[in-house]
């Protein structure tokens, strides 16, 4: 008969091996998706603008110490939030002297408009807060707070 298995023919994989294979496959898939989401956020304008502000802020640079390291977002943190018009992030940063979190609040007028920063501040591990950027003025003038 056509469906009969013969000695040496291809047999189905044992259950344990199948579970192991699928576990490795799904874990690898999850890792790739997690990496791609991180990459998506790090290329977004709200993220880039905040990092540029941090890199150009002398007091924050002095507090962290060179070289400045920007770490991956913790995606499971509920305070990291992005929707159509608002983005609120906690970006882990570190340097040779200290480490901390860069708090970012960014917004835009609508889905296809450009992101702009509302507020960026650095909170160091010891609790010190350094204002890096704050949007001020009724007309939306961007003013650094140093």
Curated annotation (Swiss-Prot):
<keyword id="KW-0999">Mitochondrion inner membrane</keyword>
<feature type="topological domain" description="Mitochondrial matrix">
    <location>
        <begin position="1"/>
        <end position="14"/>
    </location>
</feature>
<dbReference type="Pfam" id="PF08695">
    <property type="entry name" value="Coa1"/>
</dbReference>
<comment type="similarity">
    <text>Belongs to the COA1 family.</text>
</comment>
<dbReference type="GO" id="GO:0033617">
    <property type="term" value="P:mitochondrial cytochrome c oxidase assembly"/>
</dbReference>
<dbReference type="InterPro" id="IPR014807">
    <property type="entry name" value="Coa1"/>
</dbReference>
<dbReference type="GO" id="GO:0032981">
    <property type="term" value="P:mitochondrial respiratory chain complex I assembly"/>
</dbReference>
<keyword id="KW-0496">Mitochondrion</keyword>
<protein>
    <recommendedName>
        <fullName>Cytochrome c oxidase assembly factor 1 homolog</fullName>
    </recommendedName>
</protein>
<feature type="transmembrane region" description="Helical">
    <location>
        <begin position="15"/>
        <end position="37"/>
    </location>
</feature>
<feature type="topological domain" description="Mitochondrial intermembrane">
    <location>
        <begin position="38"/>
        <end position="146"/>
    </location>
</feature>
<keyword id="KW-0472">Membrane</keyword>
<comment type="function">
    <text>Component of the MITRAC (mitochondrial translation regulation assembly intermediate of cytochrome c oxidase complex) complex, that regulates cytochrome c oxidase assembly. MITRAC complexes regulate both translation of mitochondrial encoded components and assembly of nuclear-encoded components imported in mitochondrion. Required for assembly of mitochondrial respiratory chain complex I and complex IV. As part of the MCIA complex, required for efficient assembly of the mitochondrial complex I.</text>
</comment>
<keyword id="KW-0812">Transmembrane</keyword>
<comment type="subunit">
    <text>Component of the MITRAC (mitochondrial translation regulation assembly intermediate of cytochrome c oxidase complex) complex, the core components of this complex being COA3/MITRAC12 and COX14. Interacts with COX17 and COA6. Part of the mitochondrial complex I assembly/MCIA complex that comprises at least the core subunits TMEM126B, NDUFAF1, ECSIT and ACAD9 and complement subunits such as COA1 and TMEM186.</text>
</comment>
<dbReference type="GO" id="GO:0005739">
    <property type="term" value="C:mitochondrion"/>
</dbReference>
<dbReference type="GO" id="GO:0005743">
    <property type="term" value="C:mitochondrial inner membrane"/>
</dbReference>
<dbReference type="GO" id="GO:0005829">
    <property type="term" value="C:cytosol"/>
</dbReference>
<keyword id="KW-1133">Transmembrane helix</keyword>
